[in-house]
Each structure stands twice: as structure tokens, then as C-alpha cells.
Swiss-Prot record:
Gene Ontology cellular-component terms listed: plasma membrane
Organism of this sequence: Arabidopsis thaliana
Residue intervals on the Cytoplasmic side: 466-852
Main localisation: membrane
Signal sequence range: 1-19
Ranges of residues in domain EGF-like: 285-321
Annotated protein name in UniProt: G-type lectin S-receptor-like serine/threonine-protein kinase At4g03230
Length: 852
């Protein structure tokens, strides 16, 4: 026996000597070779030195547990992406990784005990197998030396980490570590949803813990970002965002990224920052309310409240004792039946609840109006709630969603909310309105009562009395709030008039439906902006100041406060509320809500930390931060946003005031078109219109609009061309660039183009990052857009195609642009303080707005 053990150890030693040179700093292990854990630390390293395979002890533990794993090469601390024997650690230092006689990969100890193997079909005598560590981190077992004959691979047997090159399908799961230093299977599993396509789920043991949302479904704030969905699909699937197909991203952007199911229950996406540290880009669930159905059925979650969970009005906890102790999983149930005996419909009502997340509805259909949608729910005793939306106003397409089962996964919040009308029995309404802060964590929430005229006159009197009292108290509260606001300016329209202005006319909306963005209380906005403090002022626009605000949970917003009496200001307010609410695109700024209280008229937008495009490209220092690739992405993003407005949105819209100061930049420098106050809607086959009131910004208006008042989609194309040329040159169109010729930037660009010296227009800050061919392509497109004849200008769909083209030589040759002289010859008597005279006698109303 002793002799046999000695002989076995001798063989291991010989095998180690045979393979040591082949293993250390190698990417391949052949049959009969071994990788031994000892003081030498033998490892397999991928060809490009990106990944390494070897034995490790988790997170520097001092115990004897040894695991075979793969980690990023030469990166500290160790970032392990795959573990072989996660359930069976080797408990001594004598552990060996080898290819067994039957062709399987094995982890064994010095006594030959097997701790892990691949479990694949044994190889034939003639088939030689080898194991190779690829540069993408995939460990592959290959037959006959042919990399196409993959017998087994770690990418199809992951642990807790997903790497570029893997593909998430219905059979793949990511299982978390048990703890920070224990790689055995933990409590959490990430996988594709087996019931709904392209959705993802985190399971906590056998319970659903988190579920992603998909853009285009009814509602879901936990939408999986497009970049991550694309990553998980191995860059093969076409992903849609807001019902629009999104073009593929560059796979090179994912080189140093990983997706991990953590032991804490979070799905996390990381990118290597500067090749040294992992930056967390995305994680879900991000808070307690992001956990699936955190408050149970008919329970609403808001992690910013003192009490995270509350039962909906008219509901009570199923298990009160547990609820009081903070266990909300049991949810809530109705205090009263919603139908009478034998299913007879009685006087039920609906509460309007603004939610940012709710479980999927059970059915949907096209309804002519909200009244029809409400009736569908009311006439069905199983109906718990409904929601209504006008999907396409021009074609009168509407949607009605119905919930027949208990509502779950309810989450309230400020941003991105939708209205869901909860069915409640009449007796429960009065008690809710009167008791203010309820017994089960019900906050003081304004409740909209939709009264159904089937209940008795006595019930009507009770409800109307309660409602009247509530409205009176709310108005007194608002008047008190208005008293604290400085009255430096007085606005000309009443609250009633402006609300009628919002909900009237061109959209033909049902007044009870209103618009698609929430209305906020003035008190909320005053608190968010520190009572419109000057310290929070971002800038002064043509229609009023813009302030930075902070909602609970560090949600940043931008608040535009309408300035003194202005026809343009009121028109802008109406446009931005009722128009932007209907638009959703990644390159359009998002309207989050509005407020009309007394004389105050406020618009709430998503906050853009990097202000506007002009803030960067016209500043000698800041322009260095926008390299050529970033400017190309910005130009393409603006083009896609305009294409959506002109062609792909539910409304066909002309912006009429596109300029660099109206292009806002988010945290990742993605462009967002803003300021739709001057926008116009075109319906049907309408392509152009005329106006006697020319509004816009000097230097960006097309000649036919500035001189004749004629505007069309090609007017926006002209403005886009100016923005393109300004972006690539770093020069303003309204400045003098050739004083002796008195040319605008467009004229200067045209002269350089004709002389085949277009590259001289390049912003000096782009000398190192720009490619000549790419620059000339953008200049070509810009000049095509500013041609004098609108019929010669391309459509935005053609512009997007040309910008995506790889060959500039195939683009059309531009014709002469519309030159605009900046000033007439100065009189010799003019003093230095005299304002320059304009050559045109046309009266122009010009808006000069600072970027937020």
C-alpha cells in the first residue's frame, strides 16, 4: 500500500516535470499534463494575457480551501469570473488540475480523489484532447487539436459572472456566491424569464426577487438598459426602446466589462476604469422598493417615505401583526366587497393612483375614450383596476388596460409615473378622505374621485361633501404657499385659463384624461429648489429662469419658471406640456411634470449635468473634452432625434428652434434636443406652413423662414446643418470668420470646400483625434443641409443614412448655401456704442436662451 502511494506521488511529480514548461505562462494544457497548486503557483494564461486560470483561496482567506478558477490577469485585487469546484474545495495545498484518461477535465488531490470534473462523454483512444484558455476568458476542452471541435466550455457552464462572448439563453443561469469569501451556490440566481420574452429575473431561492421591465410594455421603471440587453444577447438581438429599433453598438465598447450576480442579491454590470478599477455602471434591485412585490398584493412601496409600505386606500393588511413589525410580504386585501351579492354591480368608485411600476395587466383593447374603458372595468366584478392612454392622437388610437387579478409589484414615485385607476367600494372612500394619515401607513395623497352614477343619492351627498371639504383645504394650503413667494412679476393668466389652455383644442383630448405627465404640488417644487434660491439657478432662458431641484432620493431635476406676461411664454408652456408629453426618444429631453398654482406656471425636466453643446464647443478649454468620436456621436444623436420628430413619432413635429444651446448633454455626453416652445405639429400630408410671426434664433433660421415666414421640415434640416458645421469647426455661425469678405461661417465653409481646403475648418482641438475622411463627410452633410433651395436639402432619414455611411465619396455634391450677411456697411459716424444695423427690414422675434 505504501509502495503504491509512493508510486502515485512519483508519477505526479514526473507529470509535473514534464508539463511545467508547457503550463507556466501558457494558454494550453495537453492530455497527460497537469497544473499543480504549490509554491510555484502554476497557471494557464491566455495568449493576449487577459485571463489566467489557476488555484486560489477566496479573497485572501487564511484557511486551506483551494478552488480552481479563472480571473483577470495581473489585476488586483483578484477578480474571479469562474470557479470549477465551487461546491467541493480541496482542503489541502496538494491539488491538481489535469485531463483524465477518459478525456475529462478534473480537479483532484494528492490521493487521487476527484473534487470536480466536466462529466462529458469519454474520448476514443484515437481522439486527443487539450484544454485552452481563450482571450475572452472561456476555458475550452478541444478534441483532436481542432478549435472547432469544442467538447466542453466554461462559457456554457458559468458560475456568477457573464463575460463578453457568452450568450444568455433560457438554459443559462448565473448563481451568486454564498458570501464574499465562499464561492459555493448562494441564495440568488439570475436568468431569462421563461414566461415573457427578453425579460430577466432574479430568484431568491424559489421566490421571485426582481424582474426587469421591457420598454413598450405597460409600465416598468426597472427596464434593462439597452446596452446591457445587447451585451447579454452576445450582440445579436435587435433591441427596441420605446417601440423604436435601436442600432447596434460597437462590441469593442464591452472589452473590459462583466455582469455579475452578487451574493447580496444585486445583478451588477461593471466596466474596467483605466484598466485598474471596476466602475459599477448599473445594478438592480437598487433599493428596497425595487425588490419584486416588496409590499405584497395591493401594497404600494415608496422607499423615501418614513413607512416604506402602505396599503392602497380601501385596503388593509392581511397580517396586521407582521405588517407592524415590518414584514410586508403578506400584502393587503379589500376592506369591502366591490360587487354586491350574486355579482350585482353597486356604487363602486375609482381612485387615481400615480405609479412608476405595477404588475402586467391581464388584458388590453382599443377603447374609443376613457369612459368606455372605465365601463369595461365597472361591468366586470373581477376587474380590480384599469388604465387608459391615447397612443396615437392623430389616428385616434387608444389603449385600455384591465387588471382582473390582484395588483402586485406596485411602486409609487415622482418620475415617469402613469395613472392607474383602482376600483374601491364607496364606503371605503369616505373613510380614506377623512382620516388623512391612515392606520396602515397611508400618506396624505391627493385622491381623484371618479364618481359612477349608479349609487344612491345619499351616497352622492356624502361623497360630494367630503370632496368639497378636501378641495377647500387644498386651495387654502396652496394660497398659503403662494404667499411665501416673492411677487416681483405678475403673470397675466389665471390658473383656470391656463389649465383650459393646456387641455384644449388641437389634441381633442378627453378633459378627464388630461395629459400624460404628472402635475406636482407647488410645495414639492418649492422644497426641491429651496424656494427658487439663486444658488440653484442654472440660467436665464428666453421664457424664464431655470433652476436645479432635488427630489427625495437624490433625483435631480431642472425646473423652468415662466417669466412675466409673454405671448411666447404662454405658447411655449402649452406646447411643452401637451406636446413633449407625447414624445419619447433617447435623444429628446424628457418632461417629468408641470405645476399650475395660482400665477405660477412651472415645467419640470430631467436634469442634464453637462449643460448644453455650445457650452463645450465654443470654449477654448472645455472643447478639449469633446474629441472627434464624441462629436460624431452627438451629431448622429441629434439627427436621430430630429428623424423621430419628423417621421417616427406619433406626431409629426417641426422644432423651429434647433441650435447648439438647445442641445443638452447627459452624464455620458449623449445629446438631448430640448425647448419645444416654438414647435409646430404637422398632420396627414401637410409638409409646410406660413406664419406672419417669425420666431427663432438668428443664425439658425433658414432663409425662406426668416424672410418669408415659410417653414417646413427642411427648415429644421437647415438648422441641423448649421449645428453640424459649428460642432466640427468650434466656431459660431453668428461670428465673423473672414472679416474682409464679411462672410458667415457657412460662407467661409463653402469657400474652403470649393477650394478643396475643407480640412482647414477643423477645430484645432480635434487635430489628434480626427480622421480627415470622417471630417469631410460631416462637412459634406452639413453643407447639403444648408443649401439655399429647401428642395435641394436632404430629409433627416437621408441624413442619418449618410452619417452612417462609411464612404464620403458616395455622398452628393452640395450646392451653394444661403449666405446671410451679418451687418450692413457701417456709417462713418457710428460710434463704438452704436448697435449694428441689420440688412433685413423684416421684423424678427428672436429667442436667446442659455443652455441649462
Amino acid at each position: 500500500m505504501i509502495l503504491s502511494v509512493f508510486f502515485y506521488m512519483f508519477l505526479l511529480h514526473i507529470r509535473r516535470l514534464d508539463c511545467f514548461v508547457a503550463v507556466q505562462d501558457s494558454k494550453t494544457l495537453f492530455k497527460g499534463s497537469t497544473l499543480i497548486n504549490d509554491s510555484h503557483g502554476e497557471t494557464l494564461v491566455s495568449a493576449g494575457q487577459r485571463f489566467e486560470l489557476g488555484f486560489f483561496t477566496p479573497n485572501g482567506s487564511s484557511d486551506e480551501r483551494r478552488y480552481l478558477g479563472i480571473w483577470f490577469y495581473n489585476l488586483h485585487p483578484l477578480t474571479v469570473v469562474w470557479v470549477a469546484n465551487r461546491e467541493s474545495p480541496v482542503l489541502d495545498r496538494s491539488c491538481i488540475f489535469t485531463i483524465s484518461k477518459d478525456g475529462n477535465l478534473e480537479v483532484i488531490d494528492s490521493k487521487g480523489r476527484v473534487y470536480w470534473d466536466t462529466g462529458v462523454k469519454p474520448s476514443s483512444v484515437s481522439a486527443e484532447r487539450m484544454v485552452k484558455l481563450m482571450d475572452n476568458g472561456n476555458l475550452v476542452l478541444i478534441s483532436d487539436g481542432n478549435e472547432a471541435n469544442v467538447v466542453w466550455q466554461s462559457f456554457q457552464n458559468p458560475t456568477d459572472t457573464f463575460l463578453p462572448g457568452m450568450r444568455m439563453d433560457e438554459n443559462m443561469t448565473l448563481s451568486s456566491w454564498r458570501s464574499f469569501n465562499d464561492p459555493s451556490h448562494g441564495n440568488f440566481t439570475f436568468q431569462m424569464d421563461q414566461e415573457e420574452d427578453k425579460q430577466f429575473i432574479i430568484w431568491k431561492r424559489s421566490m421571485r426577487y426582481w424582474k426587469s421591465g421591457i420598454s413598450g410594455k405597460f409600465i416598468g421603471s426597472d427596464e434593462m438598459p439597452y446596452a446591457i440587453s445587447y451585451f447579454l444577447s452576445n450582440f445579436t438581438e435587435t433591441v427596441t426602446v420605446h417601440n423604436a429599433s435601436v442600432p447596434p453598438l460597437f462590441t469593442s465598447l464591452y472589452t473590459n466589462t462583466r455582469f455579475t450576480m452578487s451574493s447580496s442579491g444585486q445583478a451588477q454590470y461593471f466596466r474596467l476604469d483605466g484598466e485598474r478599477f471596476w466602475a459599477q455602471i448599473w445594478a438592480e434591485p437598487r433599493d428596497e422598493c425595487s425588490v419584486y412585490n416588496a409590499c405584497g398584493n395591493f401594497g404600494s412601496c415608496n422607499s423615501k417615505n418614513e413607512e416604506m409600505c402602505k396599503c392602497l386606500p380601501g385596503f388593509r393588511p392581511n397580517f396586521l401583526e407582521k405588517w407592524v413589525k415590518g414584514d410586508f410580504s403578506g400584502g393587503c386585501s379589500r376592506e369591502s366587497r366591490i360587487c354586491g351579492k350574486d355579482g350585482v354591480v353597486v356604487g363602486d368608485m375609482f381612485l387615481n393612483l400615480s405609479v412608476v411600476e405595477v404588475g402586467s395587466p391581464d388584458s388590453q383593447f382599443d377603447a374609443h375614450n376613457e369612459k368606455e374603458c372605465r365601463a369595461e372595468c365597472l361591468n366586470n366584478c373581477q376587474c380590480q383596476a384599469y388604465s387608459y392612454e391615447e397612443v396615437d392622437i392623430l389616428q385616434s388610437n387608444t389603449k385600455c388596460w384591465i387588471w382582473l387579478e390582484d395588483l402586485n409589484n406596485l411602486k409609487e414615485g415622482y418620475l415617469g409615473s402613469r395613472n392607474v385607476f383602482i376600483r374601491v367600494a364607496v364606503p371605503d372612500i369616505g373613510s380614506h378622505v377623512e382620516r388623512g394619515r391612515g392606520r396602515y401607513g397611508e400618506a396624505k395623497t391627493p385622491v381623484v374621485l371618479i364618481i359612477v352614477v349608479t349609487f344612491t343619492s345619499a351616497a352622492i351627498l356624502v361623497v360630494l361633501s367630503s370632496t368639497a371639504s378636501y378641495v377647500f383645504l387644498q386651495r387654502r394650503k396652496v394660497n398659503k404657499e403662494l404667499g411665501s413667494i416673492p411677487r416681483g412679476v405678475h403673470l397675466c393668466d389665471s390658473e383656470r385659463h391656463i389649465k383650459e389652455l393646456i387641455e384644449s383644442g388641437r389634441f381633442k383630448q378627453d378633459d378627464s384624461q388630461g395629459i400624460d405627465v404628472p402635475s406636482f404640488e407647488l410645495e414639492t417644487i418649492l422644497y426641491a429648489t429651496s424656494n427658487f434660491s439663486n444658488a440653484n439657478k442654472l440660467g436665464q432662458g428666453g421664457f424664464g429662469p431655470v433652476y436645479k431641484g432635488m427630489f427625495p432620493g437624490d433625483q435631480e431635476i431642472a425646473v423652468k419658471r415662466l417669466s412675466r406676461c409673454s405671448g411666447q411664454g404662454l405658447e411655449e408652456f402649452k406646447n411643452e406640456v401637451v406636446l413633449i408629453a407625447k414624445l419619447q426618444h433617447r435623444n429628446l429631453v424628457r418632461l417629468l411634470g408641470y405645476c399650475v398654482a395660482g400665477e405660477e406656471k412651472l415645467l419640470l425636466y430631467e436634469y442634464m449635468p453637462h449643460k448644453s453643446l455650445d457650452f463645450f464647443i465654443f470654449d477654448r478649454k472645455l472643447c478639449q473634452r469633446l474629441d472627434w468620436k464624441m462629436r460624431c456621436n452627438i451629431i448622429l444623436g441629434i439627427a436621430r432625434g430630429l428623424l423621430y420628430l419628423h417621421q417616427d413619432s406619433r406626431l409629426r413635429i417641426i422644432h423651429r428652434d434647433l441650435k447648439t444651446s438647445n442641445i443638452l448633454l447627459d452624464e455620458e455626453m449623449n445629446p438631448k434636443i430640448s425647448d419645444f416652445g416654438l414647435a409646430r405639429i404637422f398632420g396627414g400630408s401637410e409638409t409646410s406652413a406660413n406664419t406672419n410671426r417669425v420666431v427663432g434664433t438668428y443664425g439658425y433660421m433658414s432663409p425662406e423662414y426668416a424672410l418669408e415666414g415659410l417653414f417646413s421640415f427642411k427648415s429644421d434640416v437647415f438648422s441641423f446643418g448649421v449645428v453640424v458645421i459649428e460642432t466640427i469647426s468650434g466656431k459660431r455661425n453668428t461670428g465673423f470668420h473672414e472679416p474682409e469678405k464679411s462672410l458667415s461661417l457657412l460662407g467661409h465653409a463653402w469657400d474652403l470646400w470649393k477650394a478643396e481646403r475643407g480640412i482647414e475648418l477643423l477645430d484645432q482641438a480635434l487635430q489628434e483625434s480626427c480622421e480627415t475622411e470622417g471630417f469631410l463627410k460631416c462637412l459634406n452633410v452639413g453643407l447639403l443641409c444648408v443649401q439655399e433651395d429647401p428642395n435641394d436639402r436632404p430629409t433627416m432619414s437621408n441624413v442619418v443614412f449618410m452619417l452612417g455611411s462609411s464612404e464620403a465619396a458616395t455622398l452628393p455634391t452640395p450646392k451653394q448655401p444661403a449666405f446671410v450677411l451679418r451687418r450692413c456697411p457701417s456709417s462713418s459716424k457710428a460710434s463704438s456704442s452704436t448697435k449694428p444695423e441689420t440688412c433685413s427690414e423684416n421684423e424678427l422675434t428672436i429667442t436667446l436662451e442659455d443652455g441649462r
